[in-house]
Amino acid sequence: MTYFVLFLGLCFVLGGLAVASNPSPYYGVVGLVLASIAGCGWLLSLGVSFVSLVLFMVYLGGMLVVFVYSVSLAADPFPEAWGDWRVVGYGVSLITVLVVGVVVGGFVEYWDFGVITVDSVGMFSVRLDFGGVAMFYSCGVGMFLVAGWGLLLTLFVVLELVRGLTRGAIRAV
């Protein structure tokens, strides 16, 4: 199980690197989906299944809409792929900066902590996941409204960016 969690963490980092290092949104969306699945799988392995499901649905629902509109705006006949030298160099430089930051920053000493899952406290404890469901529906209502309003505003901003000069989002095919 430990190796699986480490594998999910590696997939999460590689997915984020794929989104950050690729200038073409055609291939960047693959990195986004990989990072989202790995991050939610990581939460799922810790026992927080409801939060993982909500984050997966909200994150992919909101971000894939933005990627669809940016793909329609980019419309390149020959998009740059991950195998291009510029993209590979950018990814290698991001990994180098990350490794140097971890080594120089002294974070290697703090890797000794253990992971506590939600069922490790005892038989009479309430699972954190069930407490999260109650918090989502009681105290989190305002945050859900703010997040929904932000996603709606982002949708209108992207629609305005894709609109073009005169005809709106409709283009000649």
Curated annotation (Swiss-Prot):
Q: Which InterPro entries match?
A: ComplexI_Subunit6 (IPR050269), NADH_UbQ/plastoQ_OxRdtase_su6 (IPR001457), Nuo/plastoQ_OxRdtase_6_NuoJ (IPR042106)
Residue ranges of the TM segments? 1-21, 27-47, 48-68, 87-107, 113-133, 139-159
Q: How does it sit in the membrane?
A: Multi-pass membrane protein
Report keywords, A-Z.
Electron transport, Membrane, Mitochondrion, NAD, Respiratory chain, Translocase, Transmembrane, Transmembrane helix, Transport, Ubiquinone
Looking at the keywords, is Acetylation present? no
The answer to whether UniProt assigns keyword Transmembrane helix to this entry is yes
> Where is it mostly found?
mitochondrion
* Catalyses which reaction(s): a ubiquinone + NADH + 5 H(+)(in) = a ubiquinol + NAD(+) + 4 H(+)(out)
Which EC number(s) does UniProt give? Answer: 7.1.1.2
Please state where this protein is localized. Mitochondrion membrane
Pfam families (UniProt xref): Oxidored_q3
Q: Name one GO molecular function term.
A: NADH dehydrogenase (ubiquinone) activity
Q: What class of enzyme is it?
A: translocase
- Would you tell me the Gene Ontology cellular component terms? mitochondrial membrane
Function recorded in the entry: Core subunit of the mitochondrial membrane respiratory chain NADH dehydrogenase (Complex I) that is believed to belong to the minimal assembly required for catalysis. Complex I functions in the transfer of electrons from NADH to the respiratory chain. The immediate electron acceptor for the enzyme is believed to be ubiquinone.
Q: Which family does it belong to?
A: Belongs to the complex I subunit 6 family.
Q: Which PANTHER family match?
A: NADH UBIQUINONE OXIDOREDUCTASE SUBUNIT ND6, NADH-UBIQUINONE OXIDOREDUCTASE CHAIN 6
Please identify the protein, giving its name as recorded: NADH-ubiquinone oxidoreductase chain 6
UniProt organism field = Alle alle
What are the leading ranks of the lineage? Eukaryota, Metazoa, Chordata, Craniata, Vertebrata
